């Protein structure tokens, strides 16, 4: 952070992540109507103007509510399903740049512990907050995070927080694992 401003940080993230968001959304729009089948019941009922609206919202990474779904899977971007994980990555990057980068090792350790509790809550289906009751078929799994419903938001946040905070803590305590020829 000595050589990079917050603006530069955000710019680097956008340059790295956003071209694929746009490309995936445009490809999804081109092939949208070809996906008509029983697994995607809403496709043939979707007017073209709504697809264009979803293209705009998808390219801008504006998540859509369940009521705007055009495929039937309640995704935040019906044209580019995997962007749900990038949405969480964008949120993590924003929080990191504005706040989390200032956390001490102790504060990061506390957040790791809290995030671990959320992870355990989902993994063992403890359901501390009463959000997992509707997930009978997906109980004891981390399937979810791609929709703007309370249970999906909880799963998405949990999937983000633990690995994010553990990675930051490991980086701060210089306990990085070196793997010979791990990346070329």
Where are these predicted regions, by residue range?
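Alpha-helical transmembrane segments and their immediate interhelical/interface regions
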Residues: 1-21, 74-84, 148-152
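Transmembrane alpha-helical segments and their boundary/interface "anchor" motifs
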Residues: 2-38, 42-57, 92-93, 159, ...
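Aromatic-enriched alpha-helical transmembrane segments of multi-pass intramembrane proteins
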Residues: 50-184
């Amino acid at each position: 952070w000595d050589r990079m401003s917050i603006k530069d940080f955000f710019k680097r993230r956008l340059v790295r992540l956003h071209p694929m968001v746009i490309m995936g959304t445009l490809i999804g729009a081109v092939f949208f109507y070809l996906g008509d089948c029983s697994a995607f019941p809403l496709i043939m009922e979707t007017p073209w103007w709504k697809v264009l609206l979803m293209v705009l919202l998808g390219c801008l990474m504006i998540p859509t509510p369940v009521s705007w779904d055009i495929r039937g899977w309640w995704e935040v971007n019906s044209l580019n399903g995997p962007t749900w994980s990038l949405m969480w990555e964008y949120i993590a990057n924003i929080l990191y740049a504005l706040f989390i980068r200032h956390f001490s090792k102790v504060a990061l350790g506390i957040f790791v512990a809290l995030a671990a509790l959320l992870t355990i809550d989902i993994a063992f289906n403890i359901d501390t907050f009463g959000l997992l009751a509707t997930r009978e078929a997906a109980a004891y799994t981390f399937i979810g995070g791609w929709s703007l419903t309370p249970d999906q938001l909880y799963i998405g946040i949990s999937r983000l927080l633990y690995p994010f905070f553990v990675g930051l803590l490991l980086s701060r305590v210089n306990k990085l694992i070196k793997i010979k020829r791990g990346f070329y």
